[in-house]
Structures are given as structure tokens and as C-alpha cells.
Amino acid sequence: MAQFTLWSHAHGPNPWKVVQALKELDLTYETRYVNFSKNEQKSPEHLALNPNGRVPTLIDHHNNDYTIWESDAILIYLADKYDTERKISLPRDHPEYYKVIQYLFFQASGQGIIWGQAGWFSVYHQELVISAITRYRNEIKRVLGVLEDILKDRDYLVANRFTIADLSFISWNNFLEIIFAEGKFSIEEEVPQLDFEKEFPRTYSWHQRLLARPASKATFEERSKALDN
């Protein structure tokens, strides 16, 4: 039996953060994909585990079926409990430990929410709302500018090494091309566009460095297979 059960969805970015962390730490897991069109994430079974009814939700069968949700909280849990070799984290007594936590909060409040809303209004919303698309695309560029400034003198966010702080940004940054595509609307008005590599070269290079990790490649290969099923 696998150590973990991961409630997930093939399309959503957040579960794939957890998948990569599990792969980085060589931990075994079984994935349960929910069907959003059938509202399976709101099933009684899942709500009993996660009252927010969203994914990811992780169950640790080696810890009395301990259950935790919210992707960045899961990253902290896995790092604190299972990253004994500090492959993707820092020890609690490291002077920059709390910087890792800082960037996880920044990812959740700065990147995840904004990228998600930008994608919603470009791809899923029922009507074209130019003001919303403009606002969220501009906010994406602001957040990328913050990262660009942070990365001006370093290759990674914390302690000049890969940690869960970096990992947390990967899957949402992979969605930038989709977010800035035309989407389902024909937009005649002028809205913000993005040339990731040209406008934010340090952040783009950082993202490519993260994607080159073996666990990253394995994660997104797994996602591609899940999308095909």
C-alpha cells in the first residue's frame, strides 16, 4: 500500500506541487482524481476529509491517516516530517528557515490567487469582463516584477538552494501561456500581454531551472498522462 493518498485533479496547478514534493522525497502515493463536472470534490467522503471541498487533500497512512489540505501547508508538513536529508527544505534552526515560510505565503496570496483569477476571467467566466482581465494580468506582471527583483542576486529564493519555496511557484507559472492566450473570448480591446522571457529574464531562467529538475519532469509527465485519460 502506498504511504499517501492524494485527492487531486489533473488540470489544477495546486495538486501538482504536492506530487513534485512527494517525488523529490521518494515517497509513495496513490492519486484519487476528482471529477469537477460531477462536483466530486464536494462529495460527503471528501468533505469529511477537507471541509473546504477543494484539492489537494493528502492522507498520510504512516501517521494514523493524518489528513492535511492546502497545498503549501502540505509542503511544510512533508518537509518537516519526511525531509530528513533536507533535499527540499531547511532545518528549523537555519537562520533563513522562516524565509521559506515567507515565500510560501507570498506564493499563496500573491501568485496563486491572482493567477487563478486571471485564468478564470480569461477561460471560464461566462462573459467577457475587460476590466477584470486587465486588472489581474497587470497584477501578474507586478508579482513577476517582485520575483525579478528578488532573483537579481540569487539563483533560488532562499539560501541559494532549491527548497519548497521555489517548488511552490512552478505549476502556476506553467499556466502563464494559457492565462495570456486569447482564451474563449475574442478580445478587441487592448489588454496587457506578456513576453515572459523578455520582460522578466531572471524569473524566466529560474523557472526553466526548476523545470529541469528530474522530479519536475516526472511530475509534468504524470500530469500529461492524467489529462489524456
Curated annotation (Swiss-Prot):
- Per the UniProt entry, the disulfide pairs are none
EC assignment: the record states 2.5.1.18
* Example of a GO cellular component annotation carried by this entry: cytosol
Provide the GST C-terminal domain boundaries. Answer: 93-229
Tell me what induces its expression.
By heavy metals such as cadmium.
Kindly list the GO molecular function terms attached to this UniProt entry: glutathione transferase activity
Where does the source fall among the domains of life?
Answer: Eukaryota
What does the record give as the reaction this protein catalyses? Answer: RX + glutathione = an S-substituted glutathione + a halide anion + H(+)
Q: Which InterPro entries match?
A: Glutathione-S-Trfase_C-like, Glutathione-S-Trfase_C_sf, Glutathione_S-Trfase, Glutathione_S-Trfase_N, GST_C, Thioredoxin-like_sf
Which SUPFAM superfamilies does this one have? GST C-terminal domain-like (SSF47616), Thioredoxin-like (SSF52833)
Q: Does the keyword Transferase apply?
A: yes
- An example Gene Ontology biological process: cellular detoxification
Q: Where is the GST N-terminal domain?
A: 2-86
Which EC class, in a word? transferase
Its keywords, alphabetically, are: Transferase
One Pfam family it belongs to? GST_N
Summarize the protein's role. Answer: Involved in the oxidative stress response and detoxification.
- Report the family membership: Belongs to the GST superfamily.
- The name on file for this protein is Glutathione S-transferase 1
